Amino acid sequence: TSQVSTIAVARAGSKGTIYTVSGTVTLISSGSVDIQDDTDGICLRPVDTAGIERGKKITAYGTWDEYNNLLQLNNTIILKIEDGTLPTARETLISEITETLESQLIRVSGAKVTNVDGTTVTISQDEGATTTIYKCPEKENLTVGDTITVTAVVSQFKANYQLLVNSAEDIS
C-alpha cells in the first residue's frame, strides 16, 4: 500500500488488489469521492468526507472492486489531504461518454433536456445520443426543450453511464 500508482494503473488492476493512488477531488457524493490524476479517474468509497473539498489533492488506498459496473477502490483509507487545483473539465460529446471517461470531470455543451423525472434529467445531443444527470440539484428550473451546458463527473450504474454534478452551479 505504500507505493503510489497512477489511477490508470489502478483501474487496469484486478478485483481484491489493494492500490494506493493520488488525485484531485472532482466530486463529493454521499459516502464517496471521485478523484482524477493526469492519467484517469476513480471513485473511492466509503469515505468520511470531513475536510475534503473539490480541488484538494488526496492520497488514499483501497481495494479494487466494482459496484454496478462502476470501478472503485473500496474500504478506502485517506492517507493525506493537501491543496490542489481542480482539473479543467474535458469538453465531451454525449456519444463519447464511455468507460475511458469514467470518474473524470467532463463538460457537455449544447445539450437539450428531453425528460425531467424527479431528480433524474435526460439530455440529448449529437444525433440523438442521450445520457442522464443523476440526482440533478437544479431540476425545478429545468424544463424539456432547454439547452444546457453541464460540468459533471462520469459515473456508471449497471449498463448506463450517467453524469453526477456537485451543485446547481455545474449546470448553465
Where in this protein do the model-derived segments appear?
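OB-fold single-stranded nucleic acid-binding module
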Residues: 1-172
